Regions:
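C-terminal cap/substrate-recognition subdomain and adjoining C-terminal extension
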Residues: 176-179, 210-246
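Cytosolic catalytic regions of ATP/NTP-dependent phosphoryl-transfer enzymes
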Residues: 1-160, 166, 179-208
Length: 246
């Protein structure tokens, strides 16, 4: 399903923030990142160059993105970022694009919408995988700076570019398989690195739990449990389908 009605800056962030590699037999990497580029209608070419396809919404902007450096995804940091050169009719600019867990990136933005937490937690509660997007232009950076700059200096003072939301349906036989395991006296346990709200939704879908799940939410970077809060069900009036950016 194509991604439409997003700003050029969000499109550039989506096009740049990935770890896909082009080999002789095609693009290799995370299926969700491949899906994102396909939905955006951009394509990866040789030399880490990403351009809009002929039918892309941004084709008229005559832009291209060339990734110069990647800070790979880290499960501890919960994010990844890239430094890229963006070519436009007006000239060349240097773009930092960051993608990661919404709770982690929140402190890196210069400002966030008032409904930031409500929005991403609402999507997560419905079983979707949610990533926050951020960017900034650093036009004074030369080639030497690109190769030597520290990650901490890159991933700060970002502009919020939206949420990337993936709807990931269960495999057709998931519920049946887990029921068979439970019926044969096997205890089914979920271990996941996903958002707890997403995990709780999936656990209900596959019938690991059959009641409301209450989650103790400890703030990112907290050194004690004094700042913990209880996550309660949210009531939001929207539906999900495919990949969407909001």
């Amino acid at each position: 399903m194509p991604v439409t009605d997003v700003s050029l800056e969000t499109s550039l962030t989506l096009a740049a923030a990935h770890a896909l590699v082009l080999l002789d037999d095609g693009v290799v990497g995370d299926p969700m990142e491949k899906t994102t580029l396909d939905a955006l209608r951009w394509k990866l070419s040789a030399g880490d160059k990403i351009t809009p396809t002929a039918d892309a919404r941004n084709k008229k902007d005559n832009v291209s993105v060339t990734v110069r450096r990647r800070f790979q995804f880290s499960s501890q940091l919960k994010r990844m970022s890239t430094i890229s050169l963006v070519q436009t009719p007006a000239g060349q600019r240097t773009l930092v694009a960051v993608k990661g867990a919404p709770e982690t990136l929140k402190s890196m933005f210069t400002s966030v919408p008032s409904d930031y937490e409500r929005t991403y937690k609402g999507y997560a509660q419905r079983g979707s995988r949610v990533l926050a997007l951020g960017y900034k232009f650093v036009d004074g950076m030369n080639k030497g700076d690109v190769t030597t700059i520290a990650r901490d200096a890159v991933e700060k003072d970002l502009v919020f570019a939206g949420f990337l939301v993936f709807h990931c349906p269960l495999k057709p036989d998931a519920v049946k398989t887990l029921k068979e395991l439970a019926d044969s006296s096997h205890r089914c346990v979920m271990i996941t690195g996903d958002n707890p709200l997403t995990a709780a939704h999936v656990a209900r879908e596959v019938e690991i739990v059959d009641r409301q799940v209450l989650i103790l939410d400890l703030k990112e970077g907290a050194k004690s449990e004094s700042g913990a809060s209880l996550l309660l069900p949210l009531s939001l009036g929207f539906r999900l389908g495919g990949v969407s950016v909001c």
